[in-house]
Amino acid sequence: RRPRHADAAGAVTPTREPEPRASAGQPRLWAVVGATGTGKTALSLDLAERLRGEGINAEIVNADAMQLYRGMDIGTAKLPPSERRGIPHHLFDAVEPSEEATVAWYQPRARAVVDEIHARGSDAILVGGSGLYVSSVVFDFRFPPRDEALRAELELEVEQHGTAPLLERLRALDRAAADGVDARNPRRVVRALEVASLGGEARVALPETPELWRPATRLVGVAVPRAELVERLDRRVRGMWAAGLLAEVEALIPRGIERGKTASRAIGYAQALAQLRGEVDEAAAIAETQTLTRRYARRQVSWFKRYPGIEWCGAADGRRGLDPLSTAGRPASEKSPTIPGPPA
């Protein structure tokens, strides 16, 4: 008799016999992506177990910019080691909150981890919702020029005079970049002007036909209907405060979170810091975090909808029906999605 197993919905189905890899033994790179709160983490764990059931080992690589930071657990919904089902996880808790982990820092490290996983003959599952971080690994992605001294000057200018003068100069150099940058985000304004001043493309975007870094790549998007996602995200934010986010942030202050350019501005953490300083009450901190989280989720959906060949599914549908061996090893750009995309 063929072995049988129960899937996430409780249905008992025959387990397929292990098959050889489609690309002459070449391990694959998976990317499980989507908006925050859609169930990417659970799906990635289920996928790794499905692969293991087919005789293929898999390891998970973090592609969430905030989960790189040690001690930032509750506000990032980081999965505790005890809940990782014995599956190796990489690039979680990689830097201190006082440090800055940029996408340019992340890309070579993530790719090195993927190469190490593939060298062991295992599949790598990249999971996260930070679009730029995912793209930097999955696609042939090059970064605009950098000048640390120039950026330091621009950051000082922002502190002294705000973003308005920088936006005016950016508009003179690159009108499209000025129109597209988030004027409320000083870091984005500084970076855009830095790149424009160096003669580069200030706006980082996927090309019309992006090339995959590894041909044996499969892109899986997790989508949730908009109304359901909004309710889920609002509930998650309230749950973070109930779970002790304020105490977590207070414990991170001696570790330098207030000095961390990225960590201190993370959604939820910036609001918790403001509450601890007495600038807002808890209700206002939660409400602002909910608003920013919903806005961020919309941007994530827009980003991932542009991925060619991505296969969209709901988290529960993916656990029941995602076949880890179908179209195995074929480039994502050659696959035809069979599941509708995320809600508009």
Which functions belong to the PLM regions below?
Residues R2-A344:
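Phosphate/pyrophosphate-binding catalytic cores of soluble transferases and nucleic-acid-acting enzymes
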